[in-house]
């Protein structure tokens, strides 16, 4: 194993490893690194395996199947594991081709031995949420080698649930490990300021909006189908109503339907939850080339906006506020369907992107200010 290179900034998030190997998690870290590269900040993505991902691993489901003598479910979960391992390999290949990532994979224990990073940036996602196993001290820079380094939290999320009294005490303590903090949930800014007792916290936009669509086009797979298609990006919670509406819309408009499955909840049969075996580059290509996009995925919406696609957004039960946040930041709340009938109307992307210009510029300035010593070549 090669030694780790000394880096000014270590990016830590759900990057290479996330529940079900989420495409959005990989792409927000890719985008954040590319933006730091553009502004001249030496950085590396830490290959970090969070404990919550391990707790949600299908291996645990297989173990419980064995204990309960559920052998049919065990067999189906073994097949699911095979699917996930293939997807994991595609993620590894993506990061190897497109990102600067640490040579070694770290967990919260081995992360304590990483001493080649000048400061850490905890980069977006639900990194500050109380997940299975509690808070992740790696994400909260609460390890001895991570403290006192002017760390930055960029557009982090603590989930949509209210924070308990005990968790509030912990978060207030953990927040002291960071010199600068921004969150992505526009509905909880004042609430979070009160929780951690800091007034310097601000809102920033998801990292995928920090770089241009051309940066994604460069890595997107070229998609060639004989017929135009509706893309259904079904994420986290299986939404059968969304699928039905997509097929109805496709039939009415003489379009094919392509589906990306990336969900873990609300499925009737285990085999329904098997992930679509495609790589990150193909996901980008499918979104870029679709005629219409139906999605309950937060990052599905983000890339629908980036590629200026006509899309319809659907709510989720869990952490729906992030979907509402991105729609509001682009003044596109009318794209949320819920129980409404599909009423097609073209999106005015000039207006939508002008509306979001201020928050995008503010987010870039936040990063530049937080890391200005590195940009200027200081210590």
Regions found by a protein language model. Give the residues of each.
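Aromatic- and Gly/Pro-rich donor/ligand-binding loops
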Residues: 7-173, 222, 243
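A short beta-strand/loop micro-motif in the catalytic core of glycosyltransferases
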Residues: 178-185, 294
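Leloir-type glycosyltransferase catalytic cores
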Residues: 329-379
């Amino acid at each position: 194993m090669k030694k780790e290179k000394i880096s000014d900034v270590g990016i830590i998030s759900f990057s290479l490893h996330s529940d079900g190997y989420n495409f959005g998690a990989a792409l927000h870290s890719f985008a954040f690194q590319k933006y730091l590269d553009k502004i001249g900040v030496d950085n590396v993505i830490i290959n970090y395996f969070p404990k919550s991902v391990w707790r949600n691993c299908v291996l645990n489901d297989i173990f419980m199947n064995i204990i309960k003598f559920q052998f049919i479910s065990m067999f189906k979960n073994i097949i699911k594991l095979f699917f996930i391992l293939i997807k994991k390999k595609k993620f590894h290949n993506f990061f190897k081709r497109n990102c600067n990532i640490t040579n070694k994979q770290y967990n919260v224990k081995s992360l304590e031995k990483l001493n080649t990073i000048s400061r850490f940036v905890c980069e977006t996602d639900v990194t500050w949420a109380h997940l299975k196993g509690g808070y992740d001290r790696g994400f909260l820079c609460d390890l001895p080698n991570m403290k006192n380094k002017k760390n930055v939290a960029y557009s982090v999320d603590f989930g949509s649930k209210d924070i308990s009294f005990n968790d509030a005490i912990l978060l207030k303590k953990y927040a002291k490990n960071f010199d600068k903090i921004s969150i992505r949930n526009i509905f909880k800014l004042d609430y979070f300021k009160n929780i951690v007792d800091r007034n310097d916290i601000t809102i920033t936009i998801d990292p995928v909006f920090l770089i241009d669509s051309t940066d994604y086009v460069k890595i997107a797979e070229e998609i060639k189908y004989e017929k135009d298609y509706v893309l259904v990006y079904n994420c986290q919670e299986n939404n059968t109503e969304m699928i039905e509406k997509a097929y109805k819309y496709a039939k009415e408009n003489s379009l094919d339907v392509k589906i990306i499955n990336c969900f873990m909840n609300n499925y009737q049969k285990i085999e329904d939850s098997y992930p679509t075996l495609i790589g990150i580059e193909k996901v980008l290509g499918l979104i870029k080339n679709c005629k219409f996009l139906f999605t309950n995925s937060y990052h599905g919406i983000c890339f629908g906006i980036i590629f200026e696609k006509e899309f319809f957004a659907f709510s989720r039960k869990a952490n729906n506020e992030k979907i509402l946040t991105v729609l509001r930041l682009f003044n596109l709340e009318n794209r949320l369907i819920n129980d409404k009938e599909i009423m097609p109307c073209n999106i005015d992307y000039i207006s939508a992107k002008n509306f979001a210009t201020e928050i995008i510029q503010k987010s870039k300035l936040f990063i530049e200010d937080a890391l200005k010593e590195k940009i200027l070549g200081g210590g």
